[in-house]
């Protein structure tokens, strides 16, 4: 499905990002994988290469523009271009009412969840235009878009801003072949999901009464990244186990 494509995947050392990097590689893409931890990234690259795929690791913080430049340089220098970006890395928290959130906490959430997405897209777009277009997928969330959750207003606001970015990119570059879309997972069994009690609570938010496995969300990302979604642009794909239906 992604034969001869080149994909950047951020937040690739665990959870949704790792599952997506493995899936994209199995589908034929060369993967430029990013996370802050070098050791886990190298394990991912080794797993992809052992299965016959192509991948390279670029460690770094997505809140740093230099990380995005290094990712793009790896895509161009190692694999010759860029076709797909899954801007997936982010953070959760702080878990507190908005009236108690410190400015530094607010700024950190925006830097990790929204500004990082802008920094990536700003560099990815010109590279994709050189190839006649591409697909940019941003991982957002149902929190702040379909539902507000007490104590998660900062997280929800920082992720809800992704939709403005998606629509802006679509308006500016859709006619030139770039598709931008947001993927909105429900609760997913990742290291950020918390302990068993937190996962059980999250499961109760969804019509399916369970949380997702990372591979389930990765398949939704694959759809948006692939030619199967060739007429999907400026949209939000809820992979939320029916949360939006029962909120």
Question: What name fits each language-model region?
Answer:
Residues 3, 92-95, 222, 233-247:
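Short C-terminal tail/terminal secondary-structure segment
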Residues 6, 13-15:
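Conserved glycine-rich cofactor-binding loop
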Residues 27-44:
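Conserved glycine-rich Rossmann-like NAD(P)H-binding loop of the short-chain dehydrogenase/reductase
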Residues 96-98, 105-110, 202:
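Substrate-binding pocket helix/loop in short-chain dehydrogenase/reductase
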Residues 121, 158, 166:
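Active-site helix of classical SDR
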Residues 126, 145, 167, 171-172, ...:
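Alpha-helical segment proximal to the catalytic Tyr-Lys
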Residues 174, 179, 232-234:
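Short, small/polar-rich loop/turn modules that mediate ligand/substrate recognition or access, typified
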């Amino acid at each position: 499905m992604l034969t001869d494509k080149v994909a950047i995947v951020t937040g690739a050392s665990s959870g949704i990002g790792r599952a997506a990097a493995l899936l994209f590689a199995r589908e034929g893409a060369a993967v430029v994988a990013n996370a802050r931890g070098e050791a886990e990234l190298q394990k991912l690259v080794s797993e992809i290469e052992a299965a016959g795929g192509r991948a390279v690791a670029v460690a770094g913080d997505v809140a740093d523009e230099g990380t995005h430049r290094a990712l793009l340089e790896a895509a161009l220098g190692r694999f010759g271009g860029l076709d797909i970006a899954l801007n997936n890395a982010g953070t959760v928290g702080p878990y507190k009412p908005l009236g108690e959130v410190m400015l530094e906490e607010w700024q950190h959430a925006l830097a990790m969840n929204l500004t990082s997405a802008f920094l990536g897209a700003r560099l990815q777009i010109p590279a994709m235009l050189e190839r006649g277009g591409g697909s940019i997928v941003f991982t957002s969330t149902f929190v702040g878009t379909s539902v507000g959750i007490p104590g998660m207003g900062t997280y929800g606001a920082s992720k809800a801003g992704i939709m403005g970015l998606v629509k802006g990119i679509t308006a500016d570059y859709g006619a030139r072949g770039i598709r931008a879309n947001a993927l909105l997972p429900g609760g997913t069994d990742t290291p950020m999901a918390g302990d068993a009690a937190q996962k059980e609570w999250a499961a109760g938010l969804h019509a399916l009464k369970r949380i997702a496995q990372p591979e389930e969300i990765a398949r939704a990302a694959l759809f948006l990244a692939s030619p199967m979604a060739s007429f999907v642009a400026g949209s939000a794909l809820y992979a939320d186990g029916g949360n939006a239906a029962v909120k």
